[in-house]
């Protein structure tokens, strides 16, 4: 590891600790004596995002974070919530085991996470992601949020079980 202060290639590790997704190391340069911190993280195999125009772009967590931060700007959210969402989405994408994922899947994942976190951030992101061209489209999303309907479920879609057949008596009780 080269020293960031004098560029000498010889440094020694003073302290090493496990952090959330890697290892944090405190290092000291043997020439200038300056101390600095490095982080080691697992670098998964390349993951590519297939855009609407079929271009392929390497997945960039910083780009995801930037979009999330813009949507959540000036919102009273818990510290680290945006970073957690980005980390969760990244983990889900890599767990899929695919080399390429469509940008629509990534956008839908962000929408789902933001909807659970903050409605205003959700609407902000949706307005850019869904490319609203007029106020009626925005109003429809807001109305769906207020009424509790999910955009992905159509009114004509049948439920898994009819409402009259589901009763609290059918639950199993512990013995």
Swiss-Prot record:
Keyword Magnesium listed? The answer is no
- What are the residue boundaries of the ATP-cone domain, all occurrences included? 47-137
Please give the InterPro entries that the UniProt record associates with this protein: ATP-cone_dom (IPR005144), NrdR-like_N (IPR055173), RNR_NrdR-like (IPR003796)
The entry's free-text remark on the cofactor is: Binds 1 zinc ion.
| Cysteine disulfide links | none
User: What are the BP-aspect GO terms?
Assistant: negative regulation of DNA-templated transcription
The molecular function GO annotations come to: ATP binding; DNA binding; zinc ion binding
Q: Name one Pfam family in it.
A: ATP-cone
Its domain of life reads Bacteria
ZnF locations on chain (unnamed): 3-32
Q: Which UniProt keywords apply?
A: ATP-binding, DNA-binding, Metal-binding, Nucleotide-binding, Repressor, Transcription, Transcription regulation, Zinc, Zinc-finger
Name the needed cofactors: Zn(2+)
Q: Which family does it belong to?
A: Belongs to the NrdR family.
Question: What is the protein's known function?
Answer: Negatively regulates transcription of bacterial ribonucleotide reductase nrd genes and operons by binding to NrdR-boxes.
Query: What's the protein called, per UniProt?
Result: Transcriptional repressor NrdR
Protein species of origin: Dehalococcoides mccartyi (strain ATCC BAA-2266 / KCTC 15142 / 195) (Dehalococcoides ethenogenes (strain 195))
């Amino acid at each position: 590891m080269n020293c960031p202060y004098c560029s000498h290639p010889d440094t020694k590790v003073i302290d090493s600790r496990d952090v959330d997704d890697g290892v944090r190391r405190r290092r000291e340069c043997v020439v200038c004596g300056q101390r600095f911190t490095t982080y080691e993280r697992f670098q998964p195999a390349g993951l590519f995002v297939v855009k609407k125009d079929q271009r392929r772009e390497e997945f960039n967590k910083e780009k995801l974070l930037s979009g999330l931060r813009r949507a959540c700007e000036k919102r009273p959210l818990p510290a680290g919530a945006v970073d957690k969402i980005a980390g969760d989405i990244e983990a889900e994408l890599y767990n899929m085991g695919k080399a390429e994922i469509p940008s629509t899947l990534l956008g839908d994942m962000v929408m789902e996470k933001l909807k659970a976190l903050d409605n205003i951030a959700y609407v902000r992101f949706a307005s850019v992601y869904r490319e609203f061209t007029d106020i009626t489209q925005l109003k429809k999303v807001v109305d769906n949020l207020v009424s509790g309907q999910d955009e992905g479920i159509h009114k004509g879609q049948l439920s898994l079980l009819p409402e009259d057949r589901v009763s609290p008596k059918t639950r199993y009780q512990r013995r």
